[in-house]
Each structure stands twice: as structure tokens, then as C-alpha cells.
Amino acid sequence: MLILPATTVDFFLAGLEAFMRRSGQGTHWGVTVLQLEAKPDAQTLTKAWEEIHAQHPMLGARLKRQWRGWRWVWETHGTIAAPPICWHGVQGLPPGEEVIQERLQGRSSSGALTTPLWLEVFPWGTEGGHVILLTWRHALLDGTGINLLLEKLAAGACAAGPPAQTMPPRESMARIYKRAKPLTDRLHEMTSAGCLSAWMKGMPTGGRPEYRLIELSREESARATARLRALCGDFLQMPFYAAMAARALQLLHERRDWHSPEIHLHLPIQLRGRSRELIFGNHMGAMPLFLEAGALGTLDLAVAHVLEKYREGMKQERSQASEALTTLAAHLPLSTFIPMVRWTNMGQICSLFHSHTGSFLPGRTEFAGAAVQNIYTIPSVSAPPGLGIFVSDYAGLITVTLAWRGDGVSQAEIEALDRRIRTDLTGIAQE
């Protein structure tokens, strides 16, 4: 038996999934879509797929509490066999919403998914195009992990396993509490003022996962990239997309005549040490930002405000405080974690889920021998917060995914969010 360290984010996602199960929202899955111009090479893809499973025992691991020391660890009893890649027959259209929604609920055409990764290849159209759906369990993968996994599959080999991992040193509870207290105090300030998401008390929490893709053209993507560089520089992308997401949520509040003085946004921050072989387990921590609703009037103002709050958070070591607070919470029973978060946050978890997945397959134009047209990720979200906005980027082509649950967001609201996001990204007002 192999014991591997778990991160605080592993615990957070396990707690979130426990809440989703109890509230009828199922398990937490994501789907990454690869649009190819030709059929991928079956031998290359199968070899890498089987090597991934043979080299990474995390794919068969379970998150468990270690009684000695009372901390969460990944427990594995060895590797698991790779599930066969599913090669579908010729279809006139690429896999549609019903297929992807089924995968987001952890199901395939033959029943419930029993492994954390599921790979399918769909031929479509008359010119040899193919679509790959990679369905993945969020408990074991995040955006960074998906990027690393795709690089291994694209290369056609994964002969190297993960590096040896050691348990982090123990700290006294007093030191952890001291590091967490400034964030605890700030959260109390926020909740006393009120902070809403796309969900509020009395709204349903169930319903199947829904999504809308906002696919920018190459010209629109170039305009968005130019705006990003003008406002944030060449290396800091997250504040630009965080500002866009916050303004989209603010529009939703305005349309519903809701008033939320602050928007509580979690900015993803690299938590684990970087390694191209450390694919599974969650890499990212969170930098909690508390954005003032009145400072988001235009995208330029919103980006400046996010950057100001980001610098403030870095100065106050808020990402470290967030990790410390989750470390304290990890001593709770898993089933009580999210209910405790909601109790302290007046029914909410945060204002919305948001992430920029980074650029897929940088420098690569092919995947398993087939030219790539586009790659994007479609995650599922819970309610609350009821809305997720996720940005994918492949070779300069930007795709935004809106994700929600059931009837939590109306079709008219989705159309309005689509227009606001396109306007903010391109700088061109949408009709």
C-alpha cells in the first residue's frame, strides 16, 4: 500500500463533492474537448493512455483520513488497468449537449463511469474530422493536471511515473490558526455586509449540469489578447479574466435586482511544486479576493480593481491564510465542511467559480498525429454558487464556458451574459 500526501484543495473538492451528492447534484466531473482535423493514430494514443494508467497509482487512489495525525492522504494499492478507449462509429455531427451532459453526470452510454478518466473518439462530418472527449474526475485533476495529461497523450508516451512525494512537516495548531485569522476576520466582515452568487436562499440546488460555449473567432481572440496585454502585461492573465467574470456576475445581479456590495472571488494560485510528471491531485490553491461592486463599472476599471486587490492579497499573504484556514477545516468530518462554509457565508460558498485553464499544448499543432483545431474544457459546477465561468486557450483561440445547474440561470440571462463577455473581451459592443 502506498500513502501519498493530499493537499488542502483535495480536501475542499472532496467536501464539495460530498455536498453535491447530498443535494442531488451528483459527482464532480469535467470534460475536455479536442477538435481534430483527422483521425488520431490509434496505436500512439492507446500506448500513451495505457502508460498513464500503468505509471500513476493516483488513478486508483482513495482520499482517506489517516487516524495517526488526523490528516487526509491518498491511499493506493497499486495501479489500475486503463479502460479501453471508446472509438465511436461515423456520425454526421460532433457529440452534442446531451452526450456531454451525460459525461458531466459521470455516465457513459453503457452506464456509470467507474474510473476517473474516460476517453472517447468521435468521427464527424464528411472531411475526416474527429472529436475527442476526455472525461475526468475533478477530485483527481484540475486545469494544470489536464494540461499535463494532454501533453503526455500528445507525445504518445508516459514512461516516467510521478516523483517521490513526502508528507509535509507538521505545524502546531496555534501557528496555523494565527496564519488563518486575518482571512477569518475578513470573511466575517464580508458576510455581515452580504455577498450573493448566482444562487440565493430558496432557489433549487439540483438539476442537471448545463453549459454554453462562447467561441471567439481568431480575429476576436486576437482583439481579446491585445486588450489583455494592454491591461495586464504579457505574464499576468488571471486578473483580466477574473474581472470579466466578476462583471458578468454583476450583470446577473442587476437583471435580478439583487444587491451584493462585494463579490467574493477565488483567484487560482499555484500551490504545489511544479513537475511535468506530477499530474494527478490538485495543484492550485486560492487567493480570496473581495471585489467592491461599485468598482466594476467598465472592464478597464474592473481589471485595475482586481490588480489592486491582488496586490493587497499578496501583501497580506491571503493565499497562505486560505490554505491555513482549510487546514483547520480539514479536521472536521467531510460531510460537515461545506455546510459549515455556508453557515459562515450566509448560505453561500463563494460568488462564482472561475478559472483560466492556461494555454493547452503550447507549441504543439498535432495530437496523436492529427492536426488540432481547438481545445477547451467544460466543467460542472454546484449550486451554490450556481455559476462558473471558465476560459480555455489553444494557439491563441479563446473559448469561454458558462456552466450552471438546471433552471438556475434563464436562457435570457445566458444570452445577456454572452453579450457582456464578448463585449468585454473584444471591446466591441454586441447587439
Annotate each predicted stretch with a short phrase.
Residues M1-G15, H88-V90, E127, L140-T225, ...:
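Non-catalytic, low-complexity flexible loops and terminal extensions
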Residues D41, G96, D142, I146, ...:
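Hydrophobic (often cysteine-bearing) scaffold residues that line and stabilize catalytic clefts
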Residues V73-I85:
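Structured interaction and signal-relay segments at domain junctions
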Residues H56, R137-H138:
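Histidine-centered divalent metal-coordination motifs
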Residues Q237-A246:
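Short amphipathic alpha-helical segments
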Residues S197, A230, D234:
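Catalytic-site-adjacent helices and loops of nucleotide signaling machinery
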Residues M1-R71, H88-L117, L216, E220, ...:
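Acyl-thioester-dependent acyl-group transfer interface
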